[in-house]
Amino acid sequence: MLKLTSRVGPKRLSSGLKSSSFKVNATIISKKFQSSLNSKPNEVYTKLSDSEDPKRHQFFQYTWGSWMKNDQSEKSKRETKFSIEGITKLLQDLNVESKNQRNIDKSGEPFVKAPSQLKDGSYVLTQNLTSNLIGKEDSLLVKSIASIHEGKHNRIYKVTLSTGKELVLRIPYKLESEYSISQKIKSEVATMDFLNLKLGANVPKVVAYGANKVNSLQSPFILMEHIEGDLLMKQWDPLVADETEGSQEKLKSVIEPIAAFQEKLLSITFNKFGSLYFNDDVSVTDQSSLPYNGEENPLLTKRWRIGPSVEKSFSKNKNQLSEKEIKQYSRSIDADKPLETITSIAGIELENLRNRLALAQADSGNKVENVELIQKMIATFENLKTMSTKLFNPNSQSLMNAEELFKPRLYCPDLDPLNVILNSNKNNEPYFVDFEYTSIKPFILSSYPSFVGYQGAKIYNLEEDIPGYSEMDEVEKQQYQFMYYKTRNERLWELELNSRKHDLIAVASPHVKVLKSPYVQALDFKNDKDYLYIEGSIVQLQAMWEAYVANELCNATETEFPIAFTAEYLDEHQKDIEDYQMEIVSTPFAATSGWVPQDMFDSLKEQGIIVETENGDFKVETENVLKESE
């Protein structure tokens, strides 16, 4: 019998909602929320021969939260069904590969070679089939499988082997097209392989992977080393007061290891923009170009190549686009054309919006669309496309080390203490575990890690920057303290960057941040009305454009702003953005796109605060919230 473990209960809140996740009655709701669910994992035993065992159903279902709208549809996309018999078969095949003389050297240890395809269609990195990862026994069996985490894009299972070793099985949700998921897996595995073999970075070693459903598991997957230990996030206290003893050391204990890892990422400059893949996973054209210069290890010279970018914009909400349409914009870009990385983002969004508009006008889409809103979004991304080649001057003399800032470098968008495990088996060394959507782009276009990034008003000294601060009441002081702490944390990150990569510190310039804001906002385009933030960041440039042209910061010689905004349009835009912000503030759980942690959802529903509507959606019953607050 095989043991399956699926955890439900309060621990699901450990990743948590930020206090700003929903604005209306947030305090009231949170006070009334008390979980009554059992935190003990549910254990189920199943026969390997019974693939239709109903006990397995819960093991694959999404249980981390619920949605206020389209709940069943959203959960269905996150069902991670895979063949349990298939993973047993895969491990048996891996055991055979680990003993195959073609994969081991004279000392009996596996050596580095290109990924090998198994008969079932999956791939294995034979150099990682070591006794440290899978054990030494002649047979390799699955003892148990436990669901240990339901993330934003993947579900994580822990596979315990008969040898006592543990592996992580990662199954992606069906949130993107099959092509996009396939590209992401191929690139992420190659990126982790590069970080391990070339840079010697602390990342899990990948044992096997499948980029599509054609494998024993009947699902895309990555099977990798399990890292035991606590998350670095447990040490992160972003609002610790300066007066607290050891506060600076506490903050730096989290910032420094992540900054050190970024330093490794930045240590190599590449020959193209795009993403990393294994040689056989890119086109013949991309195979002809070396990813970087100076490689002397013969085992690595033909191992990796740069292919299409897997940055999130090329896959998020792009399910209706064909592989050909996506490739047109995600293709690799020559190193001497850095601004094309901005143009490509505008291009893919325009392609997607025009496709949506065509379906809406033909009344053949699968949802009701607001045609006027789509047309406004198209106009904004047309503006971004116009600005894309003008935002920066790659040869600017006013920008310190401009040449270095525009070189292709590795960028991981998920550098975060939530993705860092302190390996308890290796003296708590930090290991980095999430490389989805990693791309090669100009460093000047990269964003700070989200745990330290701050786009709000900066406060460097509460007493000096805020008139009358000392006379304010505590509630008002706390608002400014929050802004100060966010400013401080970002500043600590910039100081680390300056000490490690001084030649790249110009990214900290306020003018650089303003100039790249339209691009950054476009990368964060999640909901339709977010186009207003993109447009707003373009409008913001207008006031400073003449100065940017005069100082050769932007790639333009004409002082006239490239886009003509009428006064009427600017007034309308200001009203639209104010209305959108009010909509967000007045809609519970808007900041999480209607997602509610399951413990909270069940508790609020039991109290009558969340109620089901006639169409199967849910809403917050305001009257019941007010009653509970009395």
Curated annotation (Swiss-Prot):
Quote the SUPFAM superfamilies the UniProt record gives.
Protein kinase-like (PK-like)
Where is this gene product found? Mitochondrion
GO CC, any one term = mitochondrion
Q: Which residues form a coiled coil?
A: none
Question: What are the entry keywords?
Answer: Mitochondrion, Transit peptide
Q: Which domain of life is it from?
A: Eukaryota
Instruction: Extract the InterPro entries matched here.
Output: Aminoglycoside_PTrfase (IPR002575), Kinase-like_dom_sf (IPR011009), Mito_inheritance_9 (IPR051035)
Transit peptide (first-last residue): 1-40
Which family is annotated? Belongs to the AIM9 family.
Q: Which PANTHER family match?
A: ALTERED INHERITANCE OF MITOCHONDRIA PROTEIN 9, MITOCHONDRIAL
* Stated name of the protein: Altered inheritance of mitochondria protein 9, mitochondrial
Specify the species: Debaryomyces hansenii (strain ATCC 36239 / CBS 767 / BCRC 21394 / JCM 1990 / NBRC 0083 / IGC 2968)
Q: Which classification does the entry list for the species?
A: Eukaryota, Fungi, Dikarya, Ascomycota, Saccharomycotina
